[in-house]
Amino acid sequence: MKNYLFEVCTNSVESCIAAQEGGANRVELCAGIPEGGTTPSYGEIAMAREVLTTTRLHVIIRPRGGDFLYSPVEVKTMLKDIEMVRQLGADGVVFGCLTTNGGIDVPVMKQLMEASKGLSVTFHRAFDVCRDASEALEQIIDLGCDRILTSGQQATAELGIPLLKELRERANGRITLLAGCGVNEKNICRIAKETGIQEFHFSARESIKSGMEYKNEAVSMGGTVHISEYERNVTTVKRVKDTIESITSSL
């Protein structure tokens, strides 16, 4: 019987609680989900650690949205955030850095890896926009990362099945492949069967309406990018359970 592991991408303490109740083995805590995930606040991390009593806590270290080419000041920020995360008792960190030509920024990654000693390290989906997946795989293995979160360099993990399978075969147990992006209760079995990957990353989120009675929908807090202030996406226990059970029930 295969030992599957399920990581839920959470955007709040509320979502962390739902992930744990739904049976997740691990959460990746992020702020700024519309930007692909940014470093959450001190308070959010501290509270997540408090409520996650049976589920491992990994925290994204990403100072901003956009590309993965970081300035010296941003790297210093990431180093300080790693130390903060360590002090708050997280089990792991999630980061990734690229060079101008789409390669792995090995010197910067070495700094971050040194700061992360004793923590589990996931190289995140910066991998999916790197120039050469095979070369990047070897570099990330050499750096000592524990896993790579990837959609197989496609818009979703389901579309990336061919590369995910190839990467798992190339890795040959030297690093864990964590399939993520668009993974849900409808496709997780197919992804597992066709790639042989055993770790999965998904959000299991649903949109919920705001409790606000008074609403001024003429104003957006996001400038020209309009995201409604009167609804938000949260992880739900049901969707976490449904996703996990859709694959475990087939064993």
From Swiss-Prot:
The keyword Cytoplasm applies. It is found in: Cytoplasm. The keyword Cytoplasm applies. Its main location: cytoplasm. One of its GO terms (cellular component) is cytoplasm. It comes from the Bacteria. It holds the Pfam family CutC. One of its GO terms (molecular function) is copper ion binding. Keywords: Cytoplasm. Belongs to the CutC family. HAMAP family: CutC. This is PF03932 family protein CutC. It comes from Bacteroides fragilis (strain YCH46). The gene is cutC.
